[in-house]
Regions:
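Bacterial N-terminal signal peptides that target proteins for export
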Residues: 1-7
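Bacterial N-terminal signal peptides
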Residues: 8-17
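Sec/Tat signal peptide C-region and signal peptidase I cleavage site
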Residues: 17-23
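A short glycine-rich, His/Asp/Glu-containing loop-to-beta-strand
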Residues: 25-60, 66
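Short acidic-glycine-tyrosine-enriched beta hairpin
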Residues: 37-42, 52-54, 84-101
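Histidine-centered metal-chelating micro-motifs
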Residues: 57-59, 79, 94-109
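Glycine- and acidic-residue-biased ligand/ion/polar-headgroup-sensing regions
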Residues: 65-84, 92-95
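Ligand-binding loop in jelly-roll beta-barrel domains
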Residues: 86-87, 101-129
Length: 137
């Protein structure tokens, strides 16, 4: 009887570990710059540092429809897929852009053992507060 309970507890622990392993941990986003662009009324530039631990990823998402985004990898490597484009891995010093209205289908650390960090610079409407909107499944 005790053996049956121990086996049940072991299977329960394994299934909990498997369920949590299916969802990668989220990343951390820190705003490092936010300023109106003086010669373009109504537009601002906002810089954010995106940090992913090993194996971390963000769910599919969009950014504000007015946002043009330039990103450069500062550390590690990022696996990126924007709708309509092939998935690609970007390494330190490489960069990419996201056009206004793009759907960011994949944003993940390309490594399961090393952290990754990038700087993303948004040009967007002044006063826009929501930088990321998850896509509902």
């Amino acid at each position: 009887m005790v053996t049956r309970y121990l086996l049940a507890a072991a299977f329960a622990a394994l299934s909990i570990g498997t369920a949590s392993a299916a969802e990668p941990p989220p990343g951390k986003v820190t705003v490092v710059f936010d300023r109106p662009i003086p010669n373009i009324p109504g537009k601002s530039m906002k810089g954010v540092v995106v940090e992913y631990g090993p194996g971390a990823a963000s769910p599919s998402h969009t950014h504000p429809k007015t946002a043009f985004i330039y990103a450069t990898v500062l550390e590690g490597a990022f696996r990126i897929k924007v709708k309509g484009q092939p998935e690609k891995i970007y390494h330190v010093g490489e960069n990419f852009v996201e056009e206004p209205g793009s759907v960011h289908e994949v944003s993940a650390n390309a490594s399961d053992t090393e952290p990754a960090r990038l700087l993303a610079v948004f040009v967007l409407d002044t006063g826009e507060k929501t930088l990321v909107t998850p896509i509902k499944k």
